[in-house]
Structures are given as C-alpha cells and as structure tokens.
C-alpha cells in the first residue's frame, strides 16, 4: 500500500511538471525578452542564444530578423556600401563597421532589439545622406553656420558652425546641444567632434534615430523619410525620395526582406 502511494505521488508530480512545461511553452514574452527553447522568457544566453524561439534572439535564433546588430551589419554588408564611395572620399577612411558597432553598444535599447528591417531602413538613409559613406559633413557646410540665436537653452558658441555632420547630418545648435547633453559630450563648444571621431558620429545618428525615427518605424519606410527629411516629401524632391527608396529596397533584398507597404512619402 505504501509503495502504491509513493507511485501515485511521483506520477502526480510528473504530470504537474509536464503541465507547467507545456504552459510555459506558450511563450508570450515582452518585446524585450527572448523565448527560450523551453518556452521561458529572459535575456541571457540561455534564452537568447542558439535555441531562442522568438524575441531579440542572438546568434542562431530563428530567421525573424531580430538579433544582435553585429550579426545583421556584417563586414560584407558594410563593405558593399562603403566600397561604392570614391577613393578620394574623406568618409572612406573615417567610417568603419567597428565604429558603428561600438556606437550601438552605447545604445543597448537599440542594439538588443534591432531588426533586419530597421537596419535596412537606417542604412538606406545613411547611404543617401553621406553618398555611400563618402561625406563626413554636408557639402559646403562650413558656409552655413546654422545657429538659431533665438534658442537660449542651447546658445551657439563663438565662431562655431552647426552645419550637418555625421551619418544623418546632425544640424543646428539646438540639436547639437540636446544630443551632446544626452551623450555626455559638449557638442555646442566642440561640434567638430562629430566629424573627427567616427564613433561619436554614429552615436549622434543613433541619438536622432531613437528620438525621431524609431517611433515611426511601424508606419513604413515613407514615415522615416518624413521624420528625417520632411521637406523632401509631398512631391517636393521626388529624386531624393526615390533614391532613398531604392537604397531601402536594395538592402531589404540583401537581408532577405520584403520592403513592405507605405514606402514613400
């Protein structure tokens, strides 16, 4: 009789464990958590590693597009872009994949949740703004001081220019000021840091991206054009808009994605 009771207890325990395992495999993790092979949510390698089912999976996860940024922006992907810049381009010896990866490491909320579509979108804009990473700052930018003297929160420093610099051409004193404040850099007094340090350059682009572009990603590529360069939309610069779309389609193809809907503005 005692053996029968022990057997029943063990059987019920196993059934309970099985039930809990099945329940856990119905993974409904938060967007920032990975679903492990056993259906549990977490952020460590046990959850986001090679057996990850869904979420921001890392190496070897399912082909959902989510994963560490370095696994999406490979050296080949980066080289395919920058190699199209001419040999005389200043950016060709300035921008590197490593500097981009290092910059993303300072934005963990980006690096740990980025998708292939977001990379295709981002690098389409990088390509357009910099001419395949040819330009570090906007053409003839030094002739455009771009100082809003009415902005008292971020006053312009004497003899400094706030023309477009970096992969997304950070411009105007109020953007340099807010960006520098966020990054812990005095970009109001040293705006040239953006064009002399490639990691800083990419960090400024990521700052603008997280603030103004990522919030509209789910609206389609067209919404990101409007967020970055709204004055090009509504037929005002069809050539520029179509060029951005062309790069986006190209990178979607390289990353195995359909461009999706709402790609123009």
Curated annotation (Swiss-Prot):
Induction: Accumulates during Botrytis cinerea infection. It holds the Pfam family Chitin_bind_1. Residues 25-59 form the Chitin-binding type-1 domain. InterPro entries: Chitin-bd_1, Chitin-binding_1_CS, Endochitinase-like_sf, Glyco_hydro_19, Glyco_hydro_19_cat, Lysozyme-like_dom_sf. Residues 1-24 form the signal peptide. It comes from the Eukaryota. GO terms for biological process: cell wall macromolecule catabolic process; chitin catabolic process; defense response; polysaccharide catabolic process; response to fungus. Keywords: Carbohydrate metabolism, Chitin degradation, Chitin-binding, Disulfide bond, Glycoprotein, Glycosidase, Hydrolase, Plant defense, Polysaccharide degradation, Signal. GO terms for molecular function: chitin binding; endochitinase activity. Its EC number is 3.2.1.14. The keyword Hydrolase applies. Residues 67-265 are annotated as: Catalytic. It catalyses: Random endo-hydrolysis of N-acetyl-beta-D-glucosaminide (1->4)-beta-linkages in chitin and chitodextrins. Glycans are attached at residues 102, 262. The active site is at 129 (proton donor). Disulfide bonds join 27-35, 29-41, 34-48, 52-57. It is an enzyme of class 3 (hydrolase). Belongs to the glycosyl hydrolase 19 family. Chitinase class I subfamily. This is Endochitinase At2g43580. The lineage of its organism: Eukaryota, Viridiplantae, Streptophyta, Embryophyta, Tracheophyta.
